[in-house]
């Protein structure tokens, strides 16, 4: 049993935000109306600012929709919030069409493209277009190993962009190159984890290669892409969160984990034997259970 003290003290805007997120992620668990009685405009503004900072602005908006009209934010803030959500929805659709187009282009050159994190994870959310993200992360490899290796396919993906006159940054990171496609930042991964930074990275990267097992997903009801298996995401999301932990874990990381739990439950691959990493997975699950009302065991 992992021991986590859950006596977490939240200020009022934090309480409000978690309540909205719980309602957004769990349609069967209505938001607490008592918490939102007699809320001042200043507190609502603080809640909105916190939601924006934590990358869950659009998701929190879904929680607001479950509140009676008399308990919702003041009209001016509500209008600004709604406009921000609408703008993000438009951006999300642009991302969906861009990644689908890029994947189809690479396919004609014998390259398989898997969408990591971001847009791919949005398929786990109740309203996919309300999962906020920044750049697009892809993993490219060979669709036919009799013709080219995975490394050759990954390099070809970059070279094809250069042939289009697109500048590719090869110094951005050890694990991926970076370029802008139709104004959207794309990170083209050759590995999943920086082997120079983390001692267990080489072993973990091999495990992630094994667990990748991509499946087809639809974005916006018409854009077909490939996303990793849920087992891959269990390991990858937890490791990604661990990387961010020292700088502070954002709520959108926790919401990603909650959506994974809500859809697939917690299934830690038997190959994950490092006790500290397993404890990280269990700790994130316990946090989601306590703060976002997921119900998966974290024992």
Predicted regions and their residues:
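Conserved NTP-donor binding/palm subdomain of two-metal-ion nucleotidyltransferases/polymerases, i.e.
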Residues: 2-134, 140-295
């Amino acid at each position: 049993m992992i021991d986590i003290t859950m006596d977490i003290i939240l200020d009022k805007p934090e309480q409000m935000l978690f309540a909205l997120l719980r309602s957004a992620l769990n349609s069967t668990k209505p938001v607490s109306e008592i918490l939102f009685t007699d809320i001042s405009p200043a507190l609502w503004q603080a809640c909105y600012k916190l939601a924006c900072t934590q990358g869950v602005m659009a998701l929190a908006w879904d929680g607001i929709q479950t509140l009676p009209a008399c308990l919702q934010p003041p009209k001016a803030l509500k209008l600004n919030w709604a406009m921000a959500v609408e703008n993000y929805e438009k951006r999300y659709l642009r991302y969906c069409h861009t990644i689908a187009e890029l994947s189809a282009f690479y396919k004609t050159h014998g390259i398989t493209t898997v969408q990591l994190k971001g847009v791919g994870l949005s398929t786990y959310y109740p309203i996919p277009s309300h999962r906020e993200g920044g750049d697009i992360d892809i993993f490219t490899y060979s669709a036919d190993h009799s013709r080219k290796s995975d490394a050759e396919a990954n390099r070809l993906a970059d070279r094809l962009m250069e042939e289009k006159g697109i500048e590719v940054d090869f110094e951005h990171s050890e694990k991926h190159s970076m370029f802008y496609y139709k104004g959207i930042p794309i990170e083209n991964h050759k590995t999943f984890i920086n082997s120079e930074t983390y001692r267990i990275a080489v072993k973990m990267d091999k495990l992630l290669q094994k667990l990748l097992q991509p499946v087809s997903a639809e974005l916006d009801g018409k854009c077909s892409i490939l996303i990793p298996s849920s087992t891959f995401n269990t390991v990858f999301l937890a490791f990604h969160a661990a990387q961010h932990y020292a700088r502070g874990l954002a709520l959108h990381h926790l919401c990603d984990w909650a959506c994974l739990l809500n859809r697939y439950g917690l299934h830690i691959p038997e190959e994950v034997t490092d006790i500290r990493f397993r404890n990280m997975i269990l700790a994130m699950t316990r946090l989601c259970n306590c703060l976002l009302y997921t119900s998966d065991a974290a024992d």
